Design a protein with these regions (language model features):
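A short, internal acetyl-CoA/4′-phosphopantetheine-binding micro-motif in the GNAT/acyltransferase core
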Residues: 86-93
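Conserved beta-strand-loop-alpha-helix junction that forms the acyl-donor binding cleft
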Residues: 119-128, 147-151
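A short helix-loop-beta-strand connector motif used in the catalytic cores of GNAT acetyltransferases and
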Residues: 43-55, 82
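A short beta-loop-alpha structural element at the N-terminal edge
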Residues: 5-17
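Conserved beta-strand in the GNAT
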Residues: 55, 61-69
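Conserved GNAT acetyl-CoA-binding A-motif
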Residues: 110-120
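Conserved acetyl-CoA-binding loop-helix of GNAT-fold acetyltransferases
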Residues: 94-107, 134
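Conserved GNAT-fold acetyl-CoA-binding loop/helix
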Residues: 18-43
Length: 160
């Protein structure tokens, strides 16, 4: 029997997911931007069902998680799966936890008829980039991510 188990998250996982998110934000040097709360996670993942998560355990110990949502490709005419965050605690890395989460997400994408499975990675995270190449992922160098947030988002929404 494998030491790794992966399951869908449940509302009682919200605090643990928030811990993972904060650990990830610290690793990415983005702690100041992390304003999520466990209540927000419970609302958007389990009440509104705007996103989903999987929890990874190693020999029963909390090891990591993946948070994802569905988007849509107009060109493919099919949904896609977008991985927002994946985090594995340092003590559990290099044991196949991340690969197990990716495999579970790929299976979910295939089962749901998704035409693609995408995510973003910080350009300085070379270990993650190497790992993703090993999975068969390819960079989308011709695309540049764009984001509206804060006052810019509010200003555009107020336009008449």
């Amino acid at each position: 029997m494998s030491a790794l188990s992966i399951r869908d998250a449940v509302p009682d996982d919200a605090e643990l997911m928030l811990d993972y998110i904060r650990e990830l934000a610290e690793f990415e040097h983005l702690s100041a931007e992390c304003v999520a709360t466990a209540a927000m996670l419970r609302r958007y993942l389990f009440e509104d069902k705007r996103a989903h998560a999987m929890m990874a355990e190693w020999n029963g110990a909390p090891a990591g998680f993946a948070l994802y949502f569905y988007n849509f490709s107009t060109f493919l005419g099919r949904p896609g799966l977008y991985l927002e965050d994946l985090f594995v605690r340092p003590a559990f890395r290099r044991n196949g936890v991340a690969r197990g989460l990716f495999r579970a997400l790929a299976r979910k994408a295939v089962a749901e008829g998704c035409g693609r499975f995408e995510w973003s990675v910080l350009d300085w995270n070379e270990n993650a980039i190497r790992f993703y190449r090993g999975l068969g992922a390819v960079p989308l160098d011709e695309w540049t991510a764009q984001r509206l947030t804060g006052e810019a988002l509010q200003r555009l929404a107020r336009e008449t």
